[in-house]
Amino acid sequence: MARYLGPKLKLSRREGTDLFLKSGVRAIDSKCKLETAPGQHGARKPRLSEYGTQLREKQKVRRIYGVLEKQFRNYYKEAARLKGNTGENLLQLLETRLDNVVYRMGFGATRAESRQLVSHKTVLVNGRVVNIPSFKVSANDVVSIREKSRTQARIKASLEVAAQREKPTWVEVDNTKMEGAFKRLPERSDLSADINEQLIVELYSK
């Protein structure tokens, strides 16, 4: 399955909520009708079945983190093998993706931009170049921007935008050095309350 390259607001309208796929700290403009789906008949929102509700939640989370279907299913399988709550495990695994950590640290304005930074060999993990967006970051790993890339205007702009967002407590960032430490796995209370991971567990448990 190919990665979606179309309008980002269309995805947010499809899910009925801001997926934070666009850069900036403000909520999506009020002109963008999140309560209606895109398309000619978007206003006619069908009543979803139980399966439909579960599927929509899975699609929403998958799109937030920019993960393809096969990858997402593999994350779920790994989460189910781990001890503890499967839904929380799933979110924690998604949060350890390098592209997501780069976004959380503020080096990329969006997860898509952060993924691009990683793919273009702009990011170091513990001093070594890593160009795999799905690379799993571990506790106490240090993520930084390559010295020759630190003058990039988009990275500086991203840090300015990130300064206006609520700072994640599980990462520690030095904007001057353009490096940060992944201190720990985020707890469920650290993450968005707008996600109902239990619906995803129910979907994959069928």
UniProtKB/Swiss-Prot annotation:
Part of the 30S ribosomal subunit. Contacts protein S5. The interaction surface between S4 and S5 is involved in control of translational fidelity. GO terms for cellular component: small ribosomal subunit. PANTHER family: 30S 40S RIBOSOMAL PROTEIN, SMALL RIBOSOMAL SUBUNIT PROTEIN US4M. This is Small ribosomal subunit protein uS4. Belongs to the universal ribosomal protein uS4 family. GO terms for biological process: ribosomal small subunit biogenesis; translation. It holds the Pfam family Ribosomal_S4.
